[in-house]
A protein has these predicted regions:
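Active-site-adjacent loop and "lid" segments of alpha/beta metabolic enzymes
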Residues: 1-18, 22, 33-117
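Conserved Motif II region of HX4D acyltransferases
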Residues: 29
């Protein structure tokens, strides 16, 4: 699935550039028509999308890939969301789409600090 999504974005980015659209953000689309295994494979290989030289947006907050794996509910999946946001940031995600802003801000602050030490 990772190669399929990467190939899709390679084509779409070329179309954007050909149309004069230069500001492109890549969102791998966690949860959209993918299995839980597909979503975790995308997250595990998120760094390959840097080949596109575009900022990466990750929207995994409260997704079924978290709460189903944890046998929880979307509202109760904050710990799982925090873990996956951390993993995404460690692989170079530039933008997080979140529901729980305070928790995400703390993840960003700690992750940025860890990258400096």
């Amino acid at each position: 699935v990772v190669q399929d999504v990467l190939d899709y974005f390679i084509r779409k980015k070329a179309q954007c550039l050909a149309a004069g659209i230069n500001d492109v953000i890549i969102d791998p689309g966690f949860g959209f028509g993918k299995t839980i295994a597909h979503n975790y494979a995308l997250l595990k290989k998120l760094s390959v999308f840097h080949l596109l030289n575009c900022p990466l947006l990750v929207g995994i907050s409260r997704k079924s890939m978290i709460y189903k794996l944890l046998d929880s509910t979307p509202v109760d999946a904050l710990n799982g969301t925090t873990v996956l946001n951390t993993l995404a940031l460690q692989q170079g995600a530039a933008i997080l789409r979140v529901h729980d802003v305070k928790a995400a801000a703390e993840v960003i602050r700690i992750t940025e600090y860890m990258q400096k030490v």
